Swiss-Prot record:
This is Triosephosphate isomerase. GO terms for biological process: gluconeogenesis; glyceraldehyde-3-phosphate biosynthetic process; glycerol catabolic process; glycolytic process. It catalyses: D-glyceraldehyde 3-phosphate = dihydroxyacetone phosphate. It comes from Geobacillus thermodenitrificans (strain NG80-2). Involved in the gluconeogenesis. Catalyzes stereospecifically the conversion of dihydroxyacetone phosphate (DHAP) to D-glyceraldehyde-3-phosphate (G3P).
Length: 253
């Protein structure tokens, strides 16, 4: 049985004061880590403080991206060594906004995935199709290609620890979401790709999230599906009450 993982991606929202207030409100109310992984992926500036404020609790802290190098002349970047030193647990890699706005490629995402494992971070690896690709019937091919390239060079044991987030690009922040059945079909296809590349055991162990306009009102429909093990949530993770409803839904799946 795969443990659900509900991760809030705050993107570029909140001040430090607001972030700390949020964490203080929810950290004692999230489900036990043994039942659900409850994660907040916050802006870099807040990570140190939030990790300190959540030590000893069941709320875990993640980053939204990172560089693949440990150090070097990469102005403005943050390395996996820095994140690990802060006590960060998870890192989102290859989000469509990073791919579209900051020229991330499948190759750079793969370098980051390998670096995350080298430094003991758990990658949340994003994949998903555009509306044009979906309408052209290319969803499975696009997602399979992204997953295969992102996981290249990993061992089956590493793949078991990874998280994949299927986020159809047309559903991110639009209020539109895939149907639970359609999302499950794509997540099942992702699992079959992992099985082909790394074996049935790795495919059975890897956790696959759905993302794209997930909110308290629809999360249970997604979590009830066979191949969906959690959610990567944007806007609905910004308010404490909403986030708590999301992670509580994970507890009952």
């Amino acid at each position: 049985m795969r443990k659900p993982i509900i991760a809030g991606n705050w993107k570029m929202h909140k001040t430090l004061t607001e972030a700390v207030q949020f964490v203080e409100e929810v950290k004692g109310l999230v489900p036990p880590k043994a039942e659900v992984d409850s994660v907040i992926c916050a802006p870099f500036l807040f990570l140190d403080r939030l990790v300190q404020n959540t030590n000893g609790t069941d709320l875990q802290i993640g980053a939204q991206t990172m560089h693949f190098a440990d150090q070097g002349a990469y102005t403005g970047e943050v390395s996996p060594v820095m994140l690990k030193d802060l006590g960060v647990t998870y890192v989102i890699l290859g989000h469509s906004e990073r791919r579209q706005m900051f020229a991330e490629t499948d190759e750079t995402v793969n370098k980051k995935v390998l670096a995350a494992f080298t430094r003991g971070l758990v990658p949340i690896i994003c994949c998903g199709e555009t509306l044009e690709e979906r309408e052209a019937g290319q969803t499975n091919a696009v997602v399979a290609s992204q997953v295969e390239k992102a996981l290249a060079g990993l061992t089956p044991d590493q793949v078991k620890q990874a998280v994949i987030a299927y986020e159809p690009i047309w559903a991110i922040g639009t209020g539109k979401s895939s149907t639970a059945e359609d999302a499950n079909n794509v997540c099942g296809h992702i699992r079959s790709v992992v099985a082909r590349l790394f074996g049935a055991e790795a495919a059975e162990a890897i956790r696959i999230q759905y993302g794209g306009s997930v909110k308290p009102e629809n999360i249970s429909d997604f979590l009830a599906q066979e191949h969906i093990d959690g959610a990567l949530v944007g806007g609905a993770s910004l308010e404490p009450a909403s986030f708590l409803k999301l992670v509580e839904a994970g507890r009952h799946e």
